[in-house]
Amino acid sequence: MASLFRPPESAKCNPNSPRLKLPLLRNNQVDENNIYLTSNGSSTTAYSSHTPEPLTSSTSTLFSQTRLHPSDSSMTLNTMKKRPAPPSLPSLSINSQSKCKTLPELVPIADVSDGKHDLGLKQRVIAENELSGNSDLTPSSMASPFSHTNTSSPYLRNDLSNSVGSDFSNLISAYEQSSSPIKSSSQPKSSSESYIDLNSVRDVDQLDENGWKYANLKDRIETLGILGEGAGGSVSKCKLKNGSKIFALKVINTLNTDPEYQKQIFRELQFNRSFQSEYIVRYYGMFTDDENSSIYIAMEYMGGRSLDAIYKNLLERGGRISEKVLGKIAEAVLRGLSYLHEKKVIHRDIKPQNILLNENGQVKLCDFGVSGEAVNSLATTFTGTSFYMAPERIQGQPYSVTSDVWSLGLTILEVANGKFPCSSEKMAANIAPFELLMWILTFTPELKDEPESNIIWSPSFKSFIDYCLKKDSRERPSPRQMINHPWIKGQMKKNVNMEKFVRKCWKD
């Protein structure tokens, strides 16, 4: 370890360094600087009157490996009187401030001109290096730093970079890095940095979590059209001004919304961002507008629009959705529910408005604003009011993923009949919500043929509706079980051009 303090042969002393001229210590005399001398035979040892202050945790670790003698730190006056005195060593003048960013100065306390001390130091260093395995050191390379021929101390902090070997310089660098304040890499970016990052993003699917927190993101969205409006908000067709990807932007009014409910929406939407399924509408991200008390949710754009809009548009034109198309829609919804079931999620809001189709005819589930329940523990919360709720939910009983199967059955029954399955349109329009919910608990669902309109439904289709609308949830199959129903199995074998179907629905 002594080699860490040995100057290299090629090192030149800095001529600007102060030249130390200290009085020689002879004949057991005490100088004016209170240097105490303890005699033991012919040997003399110098001690500084100033007791070094304790090392800090950083400096003690650094210099614990650089002492020339293992017992220097524990020496006392009593023990020194009982052993030959070693050559004098430089004392450490240490700054006691624990937050100091520079190393303490190393200053020799005496300049000993006696050649015996130089020889003793060389012999001591050689012996220690033999013990440590450093046998490549030669006496010529270990000139005493205390020789009178070099009055400029090589251990002054100002000359450290010029006179100390590379190993010690590495220690200095490591120490200074560990002592410097840690710069956190997770510091929030400034608004200008976020602006630059957002400019580098061309499409909505490339925005990361920080991009969605950008304050002026709303100003960078271009609205291409309105897809739907309601009392609670609206859905628009949008794209980023510097992008090309079309997406749907849903705006929800949160003026009178419970803050806890808003937090629930945030958590669930963030969780739903990880969903990757061809039967689930992709969720891109969300941001808030406190001035307008609104939440903006960006989702995959589905150009075929909702099942609700499709079947009502066909009714206006005197048409209906065929059983083959309904089979493909029911299969896709069941596969989407099965995927959510694997993710421990209950949708809880299956209805015609939340079943969407794109231009290619793909069917996907959307709107997870009130979804996100663990399936293993049955949910006991009653969220929202919907005419598509399963009986167990209306009664406030525990419910599971089979409640989504009920909602699917009621949805398919409505689309097939061209109206909500109530006794009459007049009753459905004027009935109070509570009475309608009580009617759902007691009615017997039935898919009826319409011979006058040349509409005849297959028995397997009617059986599928009956299984979905079992009032006892214990008798109602799960989505995965319903995929194996004979009607679904039979519809899988049929070729249906869903893309052509969507084009015909919206053909002018």
Curated annotation (Swiss-Prot):
UniProt cross-references to Pfam families, sorted A to Z: Pkinase
Keyword hit for ATP-binding: yes
InterPro entries, A to Z: Kinase-like_dom_sf, Prot_kinase_dom, Protein_kinase_ATP_BS, Ser/Thr_kinase_AS
Protein residues bound to ATP: 227-235, 250
Active site per UniProt: 349
Biased composition (Polar residues): 35-47, 67-79, 131-158
SUPFAM superfamilies associated with the record: Protein kinase-like (PK-like) (SSF56112)
Recorded superkingdom: Eukaryota
Residues of the Protein kinase domain: 221-488
An example Gene Ontology molecular-function term: protein serine/threonine kinase activity
Region (Disordered): 1-21, 35-95, 130-158
One GO biological process term: cell integrity MAPK cascade
PTM-bearing positions, type Phosphoserine: 192
Biased composition (Low complexity): 48-66
Broadest EC class assigned to this enzyme: transferase
UniProt KW keywords: ATP-binding, Kinase, Nucleotide-binding, Phosphoprotein, Serine/threonine-protein kinase, Transferase
GO cellular component: cellular bud neck; cellular bud tip; cytoplasm; mating projection tip
Catalytic activity from the UniProt record: L-seryl-[protein] + ATP = O-phospho-L-seryl-[protein] + ADP + H(+); L-threonyl-[protein] + ATP = O-phospho-L-threonyl-[protein] + ADP + H(+); L-tyrosyl-[protein] + ATP = O-phospho-L-tyrosyl-[protein] + ADP + H(+)
EC number: 2.7.12.2
Family: Belongs to the protein kinase superfamily. STE Ser/Thr protein kinase family. MAP kinase kinase subfamily.
Function: Involved in a signal transduction pathway that play a role in yeast cell morphogenesis and cell growth. This pathway seems to start by SMP3; then involve the kinase PKC1 that may act on the BCK1 kinase that then phosphorylates MKK1 and MKK2 which themselves phosphorylate the MPK1 kinase.
Other noteworthy facts: Present with 1040 molecules/cell in log phase SD medium.
Name of the protein in question: MAP kinase kinase MKK1/SSP32
Organism field: Saccharomyces cerevisiae (strain ATCC 204508 / S288c) (Baker's yeast)
Species lineage: Eukaryota, Fungi, Dikarya, Ascomycota, Saccharomycotina
